[in-house]
Design a protein with these regions (language model features):
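Residue-level detector of intrinsically disordered, flexible termini
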Residues: 4, 18, 22-24
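Bacterial N-terminal signal peptides
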Residues: 8-19
Length: 273
């Protein structure tokens, strides 16, 4: 279930309010390809033998939302590593925006019952679904101003789970890493959907070659650390971290629905013929 599946605005408002009622849209409007301030991530695993049917329905849903100019956007990704699954990357500037989108979507489904039926058909082909809300932490991100998601073809998402009360240790480790960092990544704090504290590190990639480049960049960044920083980071990893899992996802524009401004960043890729 993506945001398209949220048809109960009261429940949605409760979820967002419980997540973090203090996040609101402020400041100048960012560029269309900038990492969003708020993420709704939905991970789906399909029933055996139903992946192709779900994919067909997702492509058709994307086309219908384009046709009706529904102002709700998402990027659909498929797992390259880890278990087979889909991941929906729904951007927003605030939790309030997600709240409004949920109410808007309920109205769209009411006016277009064929879309609601199509969504139901998708959900009938799912074995499981998990929804996560996360908010960008600018002070932990680095190089985020260089990120342009319109050019991305893959996303590497690292999930970092911490022991309770060790958020400051994670922040310290990220701050120490920033000293010699050359890569670009956006860091998000999970506020609903996973055990807390959990952070997400999102890194856009333009090709699979960037995966190899990223490994080399990470190696150089680690070599560039001062000895004291390296030892402190290792200590934090041992004492504060519960788990780290990194996976690669491929973007599928034919199953995505992005804004015209976003698509203009690379129309040959995002606008399907």
């Amino acid at each position: 279930m993506t945001l398209r599946g949220i048809v109960m605005p009261v429940f949605w408002s409760c979820l967002l309010g419980c997540a973090w009622s203090g996040v609101s849209a402020q400041g100048p409007k960012p560029s269309p390809g900038a990492p969003p301030k708020v993420l709704l991530l939905v991970q789906q695993q399909m029933l055996p033998g139903k992946a192709a049917e779900r994919q067909r329905l997702e492509v058709e849903t994307s086309r219908r939302f384009d046709e009706f100019n529904v102002p709700i956007t998402w990027i659909e990704l498929e797992a390259v590593t880890g278990p087979p699954r889909a991941l929906f990357f729904d951007p927003a500037s605030s939790l309030e925006e997600l709240d409004r989108a949920g109410a808007m979507l309920a109205n769209v489904f009411s006016a277009r019952p064929e879309l609601a039926q199509q969504q139901q058909q998708i959900e009938e082909r799912l074995a499981s679904s998990r929804t996560v809300v996360a908010v960008r932490r600018d002070e932990l991100s680095f190089g985020a101003e260089r990120i342009d998601l319109t050019k991305a073809r893959y996303l590497r998402i690292t999930v970092v789970s911490l022991r309770p009360g060790r958020e400051r240790d994670f922040a310290e480790a990220e701050t120490r890493r920033r000293a010699g960092a050359d890569s670009a990544r956006a860091v998000y704090e999970v506020n609903a959907g996973l055990e807390q504290p959990t952070f997400l590190i999102v890194e856009p990639l333009r090709s699979l070659q960037d995966v190899d480049k990223g490994i080399e960049i990470q190696r150089k960044e680690e070599q560039g650390l001062e000895e004291g920083d390296r030892k402190r980071i290792d200590e934090i990893l041992r004492e504060a971290y519960v788990s780290i899992e990194s996976n690669l996802y491929a973007i599928h524009p034919e199953m995505s629905h992005v804004s015209k401004e976003f698509a203009a960043g690379d129309p040959g890729y995002w606008i399907q013929k």
